[in-house]
Amino acid sequence: MADQPLTDVLTGIKQLLWPDEGVKQRQKRRRILSVANQQFLKSGYRKASIQEIATASGVSKGSIYLYFNSKAELLVQVLAFESEAYFEQLLAVLASQVAPLERLRQFLYLGVQQNDSSPLLAKLRAKDGDMQLALQEVDTGKGVVRDYLQTEILLLEGLVRAVLSPKVSPARRRQVTNIVYD
């Protein structure tokens, strides 16, 4: 299983979220990200305001801009914040010594669990219109969102290939393919 793309994504997420800063700054950043997540869910990206996020976070509007260059960048970091634990869990699944079919089950379970625990990411995966417009603003040639989604697809395809080895009957292949892609 090629887990290097996943490791690279996780490293990128950690670098984006946690630049070298003190404990107080990291706590403040975490608080802002948590509040912004709730505001984006409640109001949508377009209607969420930096002022509301600042007030609910207990910081000034200017402080928000010390951590994030724009509302769009804040959204990307909120998505990264929601993704960090998910990618760590995926790495653990890939490193496990269980059979490929069990790995696929665990991967799919984590995806369902992630959608339940991270509704903002679920909106991204569902190609929610508000989310797509917001991400177009921030993804200025960096391909952050594209890389995230491609990594998930790459992992899923690798797991499916491992499960559908040449020893697997055509009927079983169809069954697994239908579970994954339908």
Task: Describe these PLM feature segments.
Residues 34, 101-119, 174-178:
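Amphipathic alpha-helical segments that line or abut small-molecule/effector binding pockets
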Residues 42-46, 97, 118:
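Short coil/turn segments at alpha/beta junctions that flank glycine-rich nucleotide-binding fingerprints
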Residues 84, 132-165, 171-178:
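Amphipathic alpha-helical packing segments from all-alpha helical-bundle domains
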Residues 106, 115-140:
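Amphipathic alpha-helical segments used for helix-helix packing
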Residues 27-38, 42, 56, 73-96, ...:
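Alpha-helical structural segments
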Residues 36, 58-68:
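Short hydrophobic/aromatic patch on the recognition helix
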Residues 46, 60, 69-71, 99:
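Short coil/turn motifs that cap or connect alpha-helices
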Residues 1-43, 47-56, 73:
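Basic, helix-initiating cap at the start of DNA-binding domains
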